């Protein structure tokens, strides 16, 4: 091996590296028994912090779920608001010209 061969070594193509990384991620997700992402508890905590900046919420009245539907993951966040908070949400929605807010 000459010194020039050392400098001419071919680097792996980025597509190959990306494919290998994706295979690792897919294998890791498939191996997880619950199918729940690692980041879900942290995501739930951060979402609750953001919501609590704007509304008073009861943490027991919040649910976060991830559902798989074919090749799509759906993140569902349910927050139960008090009646006064619902009225404020409806008023804000009507001012913005948004569609009616669904009642529970």
Swiss-Prot record:
It comes from Sorangium cellulosum (strain So ce56). The gene is minE. Prevents the cell division inhibition by proteins MinC and MinD at internal division sites while permitting inhibition at polar sites. This ensures cell division at the proper site by restricting the formation of a division septum at the midpoint of the long axis of the cell. Keywords: Cell cycle, Cell division. InterPro entries: MinE, MinE_sf. It comes from the Bacteria. The keyword Cell cycle applies. Pfam families: MinE. This is Cell division topological specificity factor. The lineage of its organism: Bacteria, Pseudomonadati, Myxococcota, Polyangia, Polyangiales. Belongs to the MinE family. GO terms for biological process: cell division; regulation of division septum assembly. Signal peptide: none annotated.
